[in-house]
Each structure stands twice: as structure tokens, then as C-alpha cells.
Amino acid sequence: MYFVNKLVIAMTAAAFAPPASLAQEAPLKIGVVTFLSGPAASPFGVPARNAAEIMVEMLNGTKVPAPYAARGFGGAALQMQLVDESGPATTQVTEFRNLAQRDNVDMVIGYVSSGNCLAVAPVAEELKKLTVFFDCGTPRIFEEKSYKYVFRTASTATMDSVGAALYVKELKAGKIKSIAGVNQNYAWGQDSWVDFEASMKQLAPGVQVATSQMPKLFAGQYNAEISTVLGAKADVVHSSFWDGDLEAFILQAGPRGLFKRSTVILTTGETAMYKLAEHIPDGVVIGARGPYGPYAPDNELNRWFSKTFADRYGVPPNYAAYQMAQAILGTKAAWEKAQAANGGKRPSTDGVIAAFERLTFESPAGKVEMVIGAGHQAITETAYGVSKLVKGKMTVANVKRYPATMVNPPDGVKAADWIANGFKK
């Protein structure tokens, strides 16, 4: 009788206990932050949101090619909670706290603005919330502080600036006497120009800075800056403008002849090259912040992603879309590596962090290596080309690629020091 009662109790307990896989199958809540309103929404935020929606839907439906064919993250379905990145950094800090403390998301993936990343990173550390920056470019994130809970799966502005300098030196056959800059007056624009100027002085000794213009972010009107740059008559003009500022700059600078007077570098120009094709003359140097968009490799993941995105939204994915997809896939790779190390059980945040550090993973843009910033900062190759209109369609010509180790500093070395030391490893 004792045995029977014990058996009944055991069977009853088993009947009402949650299945062993329930914790594993509980959905993961991901806070996704990008611009959904304002001047940065159309060229950056909306494409990034669209990419996030595709990735979440397709991962949940096991429709992503290998090595990401497993459902969600390690079998757990993904739930996305969108937050608008518009507004000052103080607003973004409040929204981040809401995601972490009120909504109890498992992780946050987001942020286009370098200012927002700088503001959010210490809060992520304070709240011990796994946070993956997908786009913002300032190298200051991991140069000025060390973070346990923060990762960035896209390269920094240093890569863009060094790559641009290497490209334009070759394009101009070394015949560059003067350079000028028009960049937004905050972390991204400042860092981009500092690294480009320093790189040019290494690659073209004796080059002079004709002028450096730093209008405020989202200023919208740039006639005064354009007049100054035209008057400076620089051989090369560098701009890291993005969002609506980039589009406004193109529309204002083109009719005034800036693109014909100087070789102009638009390090984020890919986001405007299709929309403003008729306003961009041949020969403008176009960047995409890495091997994205027209510079993306011909691999299975890219063929799948670019077709899926274009079929759904009617336009090709721009680099913001690629970077969002890259962040989600990188986080999935880290999660599943941690899960495997945990015997197939749902990993802890510490386990995911350990797996993420120094991780190498594949993306639609090719190989991504988390090897600087103590293993929290990605490096990738990059590419540049010049605009060329072919049968009414904007393309890039004279494409040059630069390996990741050629355009990114080694781990533990600040970008400024690396450049000043002649890019030595």
C-alpha cells in the first residue's frame, strides 16, 4: 500500500509539473530600439525595424539558412518590443530603464545614434541587462570604459574613416594637397573627422586641412557650410552625415557644384544612393559602413536576406537593415553557443556573455569577429566605390575592399594612437 500511494503521488506530481522543456521554450523578450519617427526614421530606423521584423518572424518559423536554421534562439521563440529612438539621450535612458525594469525584457538590441549609445551603455551595466548595439559608430564606447553587459556587432567609425582615406589616396593617385570636412557636431561626426584627418596626414604627408565644418545634428540647412567648403577649394571633402542631414546635404550641395569641384566622400552615402540617384553625379565616393548593400558578398545568407527584404518591402536592404540582421544573428550565435555549453539548457546571461566574447560568426555581410574592446567590439572588412548611374539605376564602380585588420586597430589600442603610429599592429 505504501508503494502504491507513493506511486500515485509521484504520478500526480508528474501530471501537474511543467514539462522539462517549458523553461527552455518560454519566449525570449527582446527590446528593439531604433528611430521610428523624425529625420532618421526613413533612411535608418524604418529599414532597421523592417529587418528586425523579418529576422524575428523567420527565425521563429525556422526559415533562415544555416547555421541559423534552429527556431528562435536555441528553440525559444522571440518576442520583439519596439521602442522609438527619437528624442534626447535622457529620453533613451528612461526608455531603456523601462525596458529592463518595467517590461523585463531578456535583452536589448538597438541604437543608431552614437550619443544614445554613450548614454545607455553605463545604464545597461548598472542594470546588468545584456545590450547589443547594432549601428552606432563612435569608438569611444569601449575605448573609454570597459563593459561586461554591452556588445557591438558593427565596426566603429575608425574603420569607415581609415577605409575612406585609403580609398581616396588611391583614387587620386596620391595627388591630394588639401582636405575639408562637413560633419555633425557630436560624437559620431567628431570621431569620424578626427580619424579621417589623422589617416590622411599619415597617408599623404603634407596634406593641409582647408576647413572643417561642424554643424549641429539635424540642422537641416547647410548653405553656409557649403559656401565655406566651396571657397576653401579642397581636393577632397569628407562627410559622415547620415539620416535626413545626409539627404539635405546632397540636395543642397549638388546644385551648387560641390560634387564637381571636389572629390566628395560620403561615408554613409549608401543609404541615399537609390532614393537620390538623380541628384548624385558620377564619381562621388560612397560608403556603406562596411560590406553591406552593394558591397555585401555573394553568400547564401545574403542571397536569402536581400531577396526576402526586397520581396516584402519593394526596396533593397540598406546598411542599417544589414546591421540589424547582423546584431540579431550574432546574439543568436552567442546564445546557442552558451546553451550548448550548458548541456542544452537555457543559458544564463553570464553564459551568453562568455560565449559572445571573442565570438566569430557569419552574417549576410560575411564574417564578423568580436575581437577588440576585450572581445565586445566587432570588426569586419569594409569597401568603397564611386557612384555611377547605369541606365537610370545607381550603382557603384571601382570597388575596393579592405580586410578587417587593415582598417581596425588591434585590441587594447585606441584608434587615435594606432593611426598616429602609422597603423602598426
Q: Residues of each region from the PLM?
A:
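Extracytoplasmic "Venus flytrap"
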Residues: 31-55, 59, 83-89, 112-113, ...
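Extracellular/periplasmic Venus flytrap/periplasmic-binding protein
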Residues: 94, 139-142, 147-255, 294-304, ...
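Short, charged, surface-exposed loops that flank catalytic or proteolytic processing sites
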Residues: 336-354
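Periplasmic-binding protein-like
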Residues: 32, 99-112, 132-134, 178-183, ...
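Beta-alpha junction/loop-to-helix N-cap segments that form part of ligand/metal-binding clefts
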Residues: 43-47, 62-144, 153, 215-223, ...
